[in-house]
């Protein structure tokens, strides 16, 4: 799946707010390295650096375009290309921070268990994931993909990512006598200029696997059909703007000292 740092950055303030909210719940760190997993263009990495300037910090991402943007943004930091599904976490780490990346990995709970085992005493795993598959933005991606003009491109392929497990699953799998786990949902309501802005937003994330699956000759048609559905699903308010509802799931797991 391809990513575009420039497209992602169009709504950077809105995308960064959940990272700020997540970081606010991270306690003081012990000695040890910190990692921004799925660092993207470095917006979340920048927050971690400001909060924990004394911790050795590395950003990990699988996309070269995102890594290039992150290195430009924070030239003195270390950024590495890595597949989080296969990445081996260093032992005695102080922080694994992940803003909007693990929703793409179906077996992420198992990965969380592995990350927690690599934490130093007092270390924290902090995760935020979009939990928006039941929102019109994502339901309409599937509906548009099922139209006769586009269905052949998606035949036999699963594009829609898997729904997140229940909050109880995370607590039951991750919490123990040695690990405290906090889980919560936050619903953000983003005021955007119009319905086209919603389309531009999801072009940077959720819509990308759908567009990647289509021949280049069909992408404009798919976007036009999708945009028409979005305009109906998100009518303008009295001020002319639209309100994008965006639920997100947060997890903070900290090993006892």
From Swiss-Prot:
Pfam family, one: Methyltransf_25
Annotated EC: 2.1.1.144
GO cellular component, one term: cytoplasm
Gene Ontology biological process: methylation
Sequence intervals crossing the membrane: none
UniProt protein name: Trans-aconitate 2-methyltransferase
Compartments (UniProt record): Cytoplasm
Reactions catalysed: trans-aconitate + S-adenosyl-L-methionine = (E)-3-(methoxycarbonyl)pent-2-enedioate + S-adenosyl-L-homocysteine
PANTHER family: TRANS-ACONITATE 2-METHYLTRANSFERASE (PTHR43861:SF1), TRANS-ACONITATE 2-METHYLTRANSFERASE-RELATED (PTHR43861)
InterPro entries: Methyltransf_25 (IPR041698), SAM-dependent_MTases_sf (IPR029063), Trans-aconitate_MeTrfase (IPR023506), Trans_acon_MeTrfase_C (IPR023149)
Broad class of where this protein is predominantly found: cytoplasm
Top-level taxonomic group: Bacteria
Keyword flag Cytoplasm: yes
Class of enzymatic activity (EC top level): transferase
Gene name of the record: tam
Family, per entry: Belongs to the methyltransferase superfamily. Tam family.
Keywords: Cytoplasm, Methyltransferase, S-adenosyl-L-methionine, Transferase
Described purpose of this protein according to its UniProt entry: Catalyzes the S-adenosylmethionine monomethyl esterification of trans-aconitate.
Originating species: Rhizobium meliloti (strain 1021) (Ensifer meliloti)
GO molecular function: trans-aconitate 2-methyltransferase activity
């Amino acid at each position: 799946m391809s990513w575009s740092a420039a497209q992602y950055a169009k709504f950077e303030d809105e995308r960064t707010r959940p990272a700020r909210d997540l970081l606010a719940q991270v306690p003081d760190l012990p000695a040890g390295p910190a990692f921004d997993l799925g660092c993207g263009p470095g917006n979340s990495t920048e927050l971690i650096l400001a909060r924990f300037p004394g911790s050795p910090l590395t950003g990990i991402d699988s996309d070269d375009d995102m890594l290039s943007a992150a290195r430009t943004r924070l030239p003195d930091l270390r950024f590495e290309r890595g597949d989080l599904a296969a990445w081996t976490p260093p032992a005695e780490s102080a922080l694994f921070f992940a803003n909007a990346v693990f929703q793409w990995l179906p077996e992420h709970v198992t990965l969380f268990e592995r990350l927690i085992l690599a934490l130093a005493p007092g270390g924290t795993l902090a995760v935020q994931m979009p939990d928006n598959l039941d929102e019109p933005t994502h339901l309409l991606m599937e509906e548009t993909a099922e139209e006769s003009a586009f269905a052949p491109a998606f035949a036999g392929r699963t594009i829609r990512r898997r729904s997140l497990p229940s909050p109880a699953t995370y607590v039951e799998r991750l919490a123990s006598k040695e690990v405290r786990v906090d889980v919560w949902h936050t619903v953000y309501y983003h005021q955007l200029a119009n319905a086209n802005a919603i389309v531009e937003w999801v072009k940077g994330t959720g819509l990308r696997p759908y567009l990647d699956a289509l021949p280049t000759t069909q992408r404009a048609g798919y976007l036009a059909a999708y945009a028409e559905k979005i305009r109906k699903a998100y009518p303008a308010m009295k001020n002319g703007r639209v309100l994008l509802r965006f639920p997100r799931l947060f997890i903070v797991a900290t090993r006892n000292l």
